[in-house]
Amino acid sequence: MSTKYVEAGELKEGSYVVIDGEPCRVVEIEKSKTGKHGSAKARIVAVGVFDGGKRTLSLPVDAQVEVPIIEKFTAQVLSISGDIIQLMDMRDYKTIEVPMSYVEEEAKGRLAPGAEVEVWQILDRFKIVRVK
């Protein structure tokens, strides 16, 4: 599980954060100062990368949040059987199995054995992002 920690105030829309153990893409962030003696707060709205669920996080801007390290690589589709796609990593030729639910909608129609795809590895899970 490869992650790093950053302050909540450093996050921007489009960046990634881990909320409740699920990697999410930040879609909205609001920062507000609560009062004369209060510290600034950040309200982060994010969408799950794998499940599409909307999650909200409210915390001080100087609090540490977990950010996933996304590893991107190319793989070749070996076979599609039911809802499992078997891939071969082009770096070290290992075989990877990815559920069909972890494939972007735009890429689903273009998947075929022999096609090269871009894969993201986030927190030991794989997501097919696009067909090359």
Swiss-Prot record:
Domain of life: Archaea
GO molecular-function term, one example from the UniProt record: ribosome binding
GO BP terms, alphabetized: positive regulation of translational elongation; positive regulation of translational termination
InterPro entries on file: IF5A-like, IF5A-like_N, NA-bd_OB-fold, Rib_uL2_dom2, Trans_elong_IF5A_hypusine_site, Transl_elong_IF5A_arc, Transl_elong_IF5A_C, Translation_prot_SH3-like_sf
A Pfam family annotated for this UniProt entry: IF5A-like_N
CDD domains according to UniProt: S1_aIF5A
GO cellular component term, pick one: cytoplasm
Subcellular location: Cytoplasm
Secretion signal span: none
Record PTM Hypusine, positions in chain: K36
Annotated SMART domains: eIF-5a
HAMAP family the UniProt entry points to: eIF_5A (MF_00085)
Functional summary from the UniProt entry: Functions by promoting the formation of the first peptide bond.
PANTHER family per UniProt: TRANSLATION INITIATION FACTOR 5A FAMILY MEMBER
Protein family membership: Belongs to the eIF-5A family.
Protein's name according to its UniProt entry: Translation initiation factor 5A
Source organism: Pyrobaculum neutrophilum (strain DSM 2338 / JCM 9278 / NBRC 100436 / V24Sta) (Thermoproteus neutrophilus)
Record lineage: Archaea, Thermoproteota, Thermoprotei, Thermoproteales, Thermoproteaceae
Gene behind this protein: eIF5A
